[in-house]
Amino acid sequence: MAVKGFRPTTPTRREMTMCTFEEITTSTPEKSLLVSLKKSGGRNANGKITVRHIGGGAKRKYRIIDFKRNKDNIPAKVVSIEYDPNRTAFIALVVYADGEKRYIIAPVGLKVGDTVVSGPESDIKVGNCLPIRNIPVGTVIHNIELAAGKGAQLVRSAGNSAQLMAKEGDYSQVRLPSGEVRYIRVECRATIGVVSNQTSEIVNIGKAGRKRHMGVRPTVRGSVMNPNDHPHGGGEGRSPIGHPSPRTPWGKPALGYKTRKNKKYSDRFIVKRRHDK
């Protein structure tokens, strides 16, 4: 997938880039796999903002993605590679031999006409999904389950991949994109290959309007707020923040302050932290 630039007709067009989407084969999604999405504006059921900078944006339909890949030993043919506005990766529409249609996350190299299979006896081939127990050590994988049968939760965004490092009894060691090495049970499933749309991370948004179309609202600096809105707010003109170190809007230390719980259950499954050398 290539990235294209634009003629500098405006200051924003000078810097703006976008994907060419040459892998996309259709612009019409499968209607039976669409559901409506209601905008929340970043608010919870009580109307309170729980996620800042969310609101507006283009209307979307949610594509129902098969993260479980539990239809075993039935080959599925790739009918189309499609754009999904709800994620950075592309998705593939597959039709099983019995006629059922499903969307899956499209890996790099998957093309229209290819066949993918799920199950313990599947070949080690891009797009196939099988338990980690049956995947050779060193294989590049994505779409990884944390609990068997729950559906993939890890390594699902554009251009990402993990690597199977070792297998020891009921657990495997998987190196995640962050560099963290983690224990994952061998009965959990993973898909072979790298997630599609690898150039997503080098795209330059270029202008605020593109972010607004994506449903992202502006981020205001705390130093220009009032003191009742932010710890950095208030004062005459460009005042110092008035604290030994920066603070979040809720008064907690910002910039490097650890917020993860010290006694989290999943700590026991982390073999190597992402910051460890």
From Swiss-Prot:
SMART domains reported in the protein's UniProt record: Ribosomal_L2, Ribosomal_L2_C
Entries under InterPro entries matching the protein: NA-bd_OB-fold (IPR012340), Rib_uL2_dom2 (IPR014722), Ribosomal_uL2 (IPR002171), Ribosomal_uL2_bac/org-type (IPR005880), Ribosomal_uL2_C (IPR022669), Ribosomal_uL2_CS (IPR022671), Ribosomal_uL2_dom3 (IPR014726), Ribosomal_uL2_RNA-bd_dom (IPR022666)
Keyword Electron transport: no
Entry GO terms, CC: large ribosomal subunit
A Gene Ontology BP annotation from the UniProt entry: cytoplasmic translation
A Pfam short name: Ribosomal_L2_C
Record-level Gene Ontology MF annotations: RNA binding; rRNA binding; structural constituent of ribosome; transferase activity
Superkingdom of this protein's organism: Bacteria
Keyword line: Ribonucleoprotein, Ribosomal protein, RNA-binding, rRNA-binding
Region (Disordered): 219-277
Role according to the record: One of the primary rRNA binding proteins. Required for association of the 30S and 50S subunits to form the 70S ribosome, for tRNA binding and peptide bond formation. It has been suggested to have peptidyltransferase activity; this is somewhat controversial. Makes several contacts with the 16S rRNA in the 70S ribosome.
Subunit-level organization: Part of the 50S ribosomal subunit. Forms a bridge to the 30S subunit in the 70S ribosome.
Family: Belongs to the universal ribosomal protein uL2 family.
HAMAP family in the cross-refs: Ribosomal_uL2_B (MF_01320_B)
Full protein name: Large ribosomal subunit protein uL2
Organism encoding this protein: Clostridium botulinum (strain Hall / ATCC 3502 / NCTC 13319 / Type A)
Gene name tied to this protein: rplB
